[in-house]
UniProtKB/Swiss-Prot annotation:
The lineage of its organism: Eukaryota, Metazoa, Ecdysozoa, Arthropoda, Hexapoda. Changing residue 200 to A: No effect on sucrose or maltose activation. Changing residue 197 to A: Abolishes sucrose-induced current but has no effect on maltose activation. It is found in: Cell membrane. This is Gustatory receptor for sugar taste 64a. GO terms for cellular component: membrane; plasma membrane. The chain crosses the membrane at residues 92-114, 129-150, 183-205, 246-271, 319-342, 351-373, 422-441. One of the few identified sugar gustatory receptors identified so far and which promotes the starvation-induced increase of feeding motivation. Required in combination with Gr64f to detect sucrose, maltose, and glucose.
Amino acid sequence: MKGPNLNFRKTPSKDNGVKQVESLARPETPPPKFVEDSNLEFNVLASEKLPNYTNLDLFHRAVFPFMFLAQCVAIMPLVGIRESNPRRVRFAYKSIPMFVTLIFMIATSILFLSMFTHLLKIGITAKNFVGLVFFGCVLSAYVVFIRLAKKWPAVVRIWTRTEIPFTKPPYEIPKRNLSRRVQLAALAIIGLSLGEHALYQVSAILSYTRRIQMCANITTVPSFNNYMQTNYDYVFQLLPYSPIIAVLILLINGACTFVWNYMDLFIMMISKGLSYRFEQITTRIRKLEHEEVCESVFIQIREHYVKMCELLEFVDSAMSSLILLSCVNNLYFVCYQLLNVFNKLRWPINYIYFWYSLLYLIGRTAFVFLTAADINEESKRGLGVLRRVSSRSWCVEVERLIFQMTTQTVALSGKKFYFLTRRLLFGMAGTIVTYELVLLQFDEPNRRKGLQPLCA
């Protein structure tokens, strides 16, 4: 239920008719300012200066460093992402970012095809299938991010237009502003993912060198060329070996790992940006407690709440495919890692990497779910104050706002199949436990076999 259309540039009158009488006694009001259509997009009149977006606490300014970093590995091929003005962000097929994206997609497709042909030769099992799923998820993520990039200029314009009123009084900027929150969370995920990838490489290299040192039947001297041909043999069954191709494979593999992590990182940044504005609305509502408030204030609050809900719906329609892909990806890899919990490993470094990877994956999944669930939690936190509004301040707008907060599901979704709430996290945990018990029963014969001979 939408409220009346308001001009947010007008502040509600707190006097009972005094200012209206004074305005009638004044001479003619000056002619209205000319409104330019391009400026009206952000509620700015042509005779006024455009806002300095660099100094505003806006979502676009908070996320652009990480979106620019993602462009280095061919995610979100947008032009003008570093511009402070969101209206300069655009998508173009004929652009350098799009060209880089196509190159990375072709390279990832080669790795996917190499893995697929290799598995056809040796036979597909539940455990060696993980590599194919990994490259398949990365390729799907590239496609989803291209589709999202086409919609992003419209998304960031509507987002900026909606959140500009929140950068001015009566709304307050929290001590830890939006940029700070996004940066802390993003740097934590990037740092932990770099640690996970580094441990993977160290584990693979040490396992390779130990095997050569301990096996008398292996006369090969440890070298970069031999390491690549041993660990990435599935690629060189399709491509001829050369040191340049080997280095490129390592770079593409690292880029794929970044894309695999960036899906959750991007959802987390979106969730931070949306829940931050709902938190500001809640803070404003709480400050009105025990005060006599005129109806126009509640009209404005409900209007801003409705605008945020409309923004959430628009953002959700643009990125629900990414949310669905991320959840399926996390569900599969958590189940796969838990399946290997009882397996014996050969070297201590293998145990270190395995447990770090497992805990990181579970922690990242839970963190993203809880961050997204904060949107739903923040959208309802003002209910307690609204229900205690005094009879002197009670009005139909308060009743409408309570009804909307109570009945509407304000949350991101995966194609509307499910909503990212705290309840879903526990449901997903129960699903993982159920599948894991079934998988462990099927994998019992493989666990009894133990480790394969080292020098075979």
